[in-house]
Regions:
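Positively charged, polar, low-complexity stretches
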Residues: 2-43, 47-84
């Protein structure tokens, strides 16, 4: 298994087991839809995005005020506009 496959496997796991069911549903659906179309850079951006805690990430997704800075990149824009 190469490093890209390992990163994809890690991302899939981290998107499915979050702690907040709503985030598990949102992130896992998003990842399953996009993961095979992402470049290595986008996969790394997604991996970085998954490092944020669910509470802040969910508030950001719902356009509520958060105390952290979520990166503004292609992956975060796709997630922000993603609907289940």
């Amino acid at each position: 298994m190469n490093s890209i496959d390992l990163l994809k496997k890690k991302i899939l796991y981290r998107s499915e087991y979050r702690g907040i069911k709503e985030m598990e549903l949102l992130l896992n659906s998003f990842v399953k839809k996009h993961i095979n179309n992402f470049s290595i850079l986008e996969l790394k951006q997604l991996d970085d995005l998954l490092n944020f805690d669910d509470d802040n990430l969910f508030k950001w997704y719902l356009d509520k005020k958060v105390k952290i800075k979520i990166p503004n990149n292609k992956v975060s824009k796709l997630l922000k506009n993603f609907k289940i």
